Curated annotation (Swiss-Prot):
The keyword Nucleus applies. This is CTD small phosphatase-like protein. NCBIfam families: HIF-SF_euk. It comes from the Eukaryota. SMART domains: CPDc (SM00577). It comes from Homo sapiens. Transmembrane segments: none annotated. One of its GO terms (cellular component) is nucleus.
Length: 276
């Protein structure tokens, strides 16, 4: 059974002790450290990811260039050829439909699923909130899903303030039924899955320019910096969540988003907080 091919997750440090952390985990570690220092403002911790995980993304209009290809004898290939990975331009057809009358004038918040709102496992979890059957290679497997504390309050308030979109790098066969159970209020106006991501240098990236919304009015909430590498200035990072039932990350975010909903554009407030 190829579980990781169905669900896109970060590694739970409890299950992988002794492994040296990679760059993609630095943001999570930074948030863990700040979690222990609750005397500091919760808002300032959102932006530690930009300080400790400084990924320079290529401009959307420019190709991404890798180092020259080297032959086995150490020489460069003919013409010093380089691998060029183009960053896709906005498509003729955007990922989201037109804004509804209900959401007219609201900002768009893109919300991740795994380790942001829930944690899922193919291993049995005694206190699972949901058990979702998923078909893999003709066999039905059970996925055990834990809800992050305060996710219900968070989603309900976000649905009142914003046009909310679920955007996950996991496959729809798993994520869609989880969203059915999680979102009892119809908060998510749209759901985007792995096929809507851009595969860039080994990561599934959520390219916000493909949504069809003005970028100055788009926010992404995600535990993985690789997911928003094209638009880090639009991100509100969150700590990866696995099973800590005392976690208050989502609850702490609500006042922040209440303030953000009143801003003319997201960059001004995010920039101010980043430089506090």
């Amino acid at each position: 059974m190829d579980g990781p091919a169905i669900i896109t997750q970060v590694t739970n440090p409890k299950e992988d002790e002794g492994r040296l952390p990679g760059a993609g985990e630095k943001a999570s570690q930074c948030n863990v450290s700040l979690k222990k220092q609750r005397s500091r403002s919760i808002l300032s911790s959102f932006f530690c990811c930009f300080r400790d995980y400084n990924v320079e993304a290529p401009p959307p209009s420019s190709p991404s260039v890798l180092p020259p290809l080297v032959e086995e004898n150490g020489g460069l290939q003919k013409g010093d050829q380089r691998q060029v990975i183009p960053i896709p331009s906005p498509p003729a057809k955007y990922l989201l439909p037109e804004v509804t009358v209900l959401d007219y004038g609201k900002k768009c918040v893109v919300i991740d699923l795994d380790e942001t709102l829930v944690h899922s496992s193919f291993k049995p979890i005694s206190n699972a909130d949901f058990i979702v059957p998923v078909e893999i290679d003709g066999t039905i497997h059970q996925v055990y899903v834990l809800k992050r504390p305060h996710v219900d309050e968070f989603l309900q308030r976000m649905g009142q303030l914003f046009e909310c979109v679920l955007f996950t790098a996991s496959l729809a066969k798993y994520a869609d039924p989880v969203a059915d159970l999680l979102d009892r209020w119809g908060v998510f106006r749209a759901r985007l899955f792995r096929e809507s991501c851009v595969f860039h240098r080994g990561n599934y990236v959520k390219d916000l320019s493909r949504l069809g919304r003005e970028l100055s009015k788009v926010i992404i909430v995600d535990n993985s910096p690789a997911s928003y590498i094209f638009h880090p200035e639009n991100a509100v990072p969150v700590q990866s969540w696995f099973d800590d039932m005392t976690d208050t990350e989502l609850l702490d975010l609500i006042p922040f988003f209440e303030g953000l909903s009143r801003e003319d554009d997201v960059y001004s407030m995010l920039h101010r907080l980043c430089n506090r």
